[in-house]
Amino acid sequence: MKKVFITFAMIAMSTIAFAQSEEPATNGFGAKLTESNFHLGVDLQTKYIWRGMEMMTNDAAPVVFPAINYSNKGFYAYAMGGYAINGKYAEVDLGLSYTYKWLTIALNNYYYPTTNSPEDQYYNFKSRETGHWLEGVITIAPENIPAYLSVSNFFAGADKNLEGKQAYSTYAEIGGHYDFLNDHKIGLAVGAAFNKSCYNGYEHDFSICNIELKYTYSLKFKNDFTLPLSVAYITNPVYEKSHVNFIMNFAF
């Protein structure tokens, strides 16, 4: 009888210990630990080209883009910086977007801090003084077709024409890609400005300002980490310039 009791006690203790080990882990607030919807990223570009525009024309240098983003059920928010390695360029971007099936609607805020002064005017939102560029974007991307159409407009902020009035710079881009094995792909994008805008020096009513051909090669590591490496040929017919750009994307 004593042996039976001891055996029963040992089984009960092991059952309790197993049950305790199966209890979900919690954080310091007592909440159950779950997968995070936050992600980090760092991009590197040897030449900062955006929508065909050369963002650094003087003292050009490679630019690093640290970013944090949150995504959940179609909702996406991000904060991203852009910093030239020679300290001659800085950028701070914030954005929100929502995607439903093939449609994405986004709102972006671009800001370019001073790089030669400890003071700035980030919280100055006066129309004629602010350094913020506020943009709305609509993107259509069919679920079964590797292509997209995006239209953006700077509806407020520092986007002023030669007369000092709001320019409402409008840019449209159509693009697509062709996939190969191992996540390699080649993509083509063509972008155009539809009014006198920041993309053409506020001088042309319509202009094709961005043609980009890009090949992406993805390095895969043993821990399932993937490092996309891209080389893009970019030409801007407005300014008759062309560039070859190397891009490296880290995502965590």
Where are these regions (language model features)?
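Surface-exposed strand-loop-strand hairpins of Gram-negative outer-membrane beta-barrel proteins
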Residues: 48-64
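Short loop/turn motifs that connect adjacent beta-strands in outer-membrane beta-barrel proteins
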Residues: 22-37, 141-146, 178-187, 218-229, ...
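Transmembrane beta-strand segments that form the barrel wall of outer-membrane beta-barrel proteins
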Residues: 42-48, 74-85, 105-113, 120, ...
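Cleavable N-terminal export/targeting peptides
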Residues: 1-37
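Residue-level signature of outer-membrane beta-barrel architecture
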Residues: 46, 70-72, 98-100, 109, ...
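Residues that define the transmembrane beta-barrel architecture of outer-membrane proteins
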Residues: 34-36, 60-64, 71, 88-92, ...
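Detector for outer-membrane/organellar transmembrane beta-barrel domains
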Residues: 124-197
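Outer-membrane beta-barrel "beta-signal"
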Residues: 22-23, 213, 219, 240-252
